[in-house]
């Protein structure tokens, strides 16, 4: 198995960090740390084997990637769309399939229910 560390180092060309609240930064940094620790080391090997890393699904739930904008009274985190976008960006920067899984579950499954 090929083990990699963080495969992507983003640059804040437009100084977007200055526009984020501390809560948004915490959400983004939590997702980023999880991706770096759990996804980056295994994702290339999973892609080479044409296997979806199903064992990562509980972790996606753990970082709030499933329906983060669903109101708390319905079991969601009650976050805003910016937080959702930041989580999706962190997933996407490592693996589009993982980001697609989270966004489809959030918008096409959880939200309509």
Predicted features and spans:
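Intrinsic disorder at enzyme termini
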Residues: 1-23
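Helix-turn-helix-type domain boundary/helix-start signal
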Residues: 17-18, 25, 50, 77
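Mature N-terminal segment immediately following signal peptide/propeptide cleavage
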Residues: 19-36
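Glycine-rich flavin
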Residues: 33, 39-113
